[in-house]
Design a protein with these regions (language model features):
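Cell-envelope/extracellular polymer assembly enzymes that use nucleotide-activated donors
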Residues: 2-4, 34, 152
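Short, well-formed alpha-helical segments that are part of the catalytic scaffolds
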Residues: 12-27
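Short beta-strand/loop segment that forms part of the nucleotide-sugar
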Residues: 31-41, 62-65
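A conserved acidic beta->alpha catalytic loop
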Residues: 39-49, 92-96
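Glycine-rich, basic loop-to-helix element that forms the pyrophosphate-binding segment
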Residues: 66-83
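Short aromatic/hydrophobic "clamp" motif used to bind/position activated sugar donors
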Residues: 88
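Conserved donor-nucleotide/metal-binding helix-loop-beta segment in metal-dependent transferases, i.e.
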Residues: 100-118
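C-terminal catalytic/acceptor-binding lobe
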Residues: 151-236
Length: 236
C-alpha cells in the first residue's frame, strides 16, 4: 500500500522551514510513501527555497499557474488529486508526519486516521483510502475558504460507514492563531463567521445524507518540479 502525504501551502515558508527536515527524512526512510506539496501562489520565497533543496525522490512540488482565489478545501483537493497513493493523508504544512505511516499500515485502508486535538493545531492530520476520498468527492469546494472542512470531511466519510481511529501526534505542530490561518485567504469574512456558516452547511448536508456534495472539482494548471506543466480537469 502506497501512502501519499498531501500538503497545500500559501506564504507559510517560515513554518515550512521548521517541519520540512523531519518530514523529508521520514519520506526517505519509508518506502512506498510520497509527499505532494502544492504551492498556491506563495510570494514569500517558497519557490526558490524548494528549488535550492533540489530533486528529491518521491517528493513532488507543484505550483499553481492559474489559481487566483485561495480556498483551503480546494487546495487540499488539489494535493490529493495530484497524488498517486492508495492511501491519502492530508498533512498541514505546520505539522509533522511523525508516526502516521506506522499507524496507517497497522490499521490498513479499511480504517481512516485523524488526530483530533484541535487546540494544538493537529486536526488537519486526516487520512483515508483513495477509494473513500473518491466516493465522497473530497473536501466540499462550495465551503467558504476556511472553517469546518476537516470535520465535514470526516462526517461525510462516516455517512458511508467508513470508520476513523484517533492516532497520537508524536511531534507537536507549529502553533497557529486564527489570524494566521486566514491572512492569505481571498475573503473579508472573519474566521468565526466562516466556521459558523460552513458548519450550517455541513449540518444540512448530513441531515439530507449528502455524502458527495461536489458536482465537479476546480480546474487548475500547475508547474511540476520546475520542469513541466500539468493540468487537473474538473471531473469528479
Amino acid at each position: 500500500m502506497t501512502i501519499s502525504y498531501c500538503s497545500q501551502v500559501k506564504n507559510r515558508l517560515y513554518q515550512f522551514k521548521q517541519t520540512v527536515g523531519l518530514n523529508l527524512e521520514h519520506i526517505a526512510k519509508n518506502k512506498n510513501t510520497e509527499w505532494v506539496i502544492v504551492d498556491c501562489g506563495s510570494t514569500d520565497g517558497l519557490y526558490n527555497y524548494m528549488k535550492k533543496l533540489g530533486a528529491m525522490d518521491r517528493v513532488h512540488y507543484y505550483k499553481t499557474l492559474n489559481y487566483n482565489t485561495y480556498s483551503i478545501p480546494v487546495a487540499k483537493n488539489f494535493a490529493i488529486r495530484l497524488s498517486s497513493g492508495d492511501y491519502v493523508f492530508n498533512l498541514d504544512i505546520d505539522n509533522y508526519i511523525g508516526n502516521a505511516t506506522y499507524h496507517i499500515r497497522r490499521l490498513g485502508p479499511e480504517t481512516g486516521v485523524c488526530c483530533n486535538v484541535f487546540k494544538k493545531g493537529v486536526y488537519g492530520r486526516i487520512g483515508c483510502s483513495r477509494e473513500i476520498f473518491n466516493t465522497i468527492g473530497g473536501y466540499d469546494e462550495s465551503f467558504l475558504p476556511a472553517g469546518k472542512h476537516d470535520t465535514d470531511f470526516i462526517n461525510r466519510c462516516k455517512l458511508i460507514n467508513y470508520k476513523f481511529m484517533h492516532i497520537p501526534c508524536k511531534t507537536s505542530p507549529i502553533l497557529n492563531s486564527k489570524k494566521e490561518t486566514i491572512k492569505n485567504l481571498d475573503t473579508n469574512i472573519d474566521w468565526e463567521t466562516m466556521n459558523k456558516l460552513n458548519g450550517m452547511k455541513m449540518e444540512k448536508n448530513i441531515k439530507k445524507n449528502i455524502f458527495c456534495p461536489n458536482k465537479k472539482f476546480t480546474k487548475c494548471k500547475f508547474e511540476y518540479n520546475f520542469k513541466k506543466n500539468t493540468e487537473l480537469a474538473g471531473r469528479i
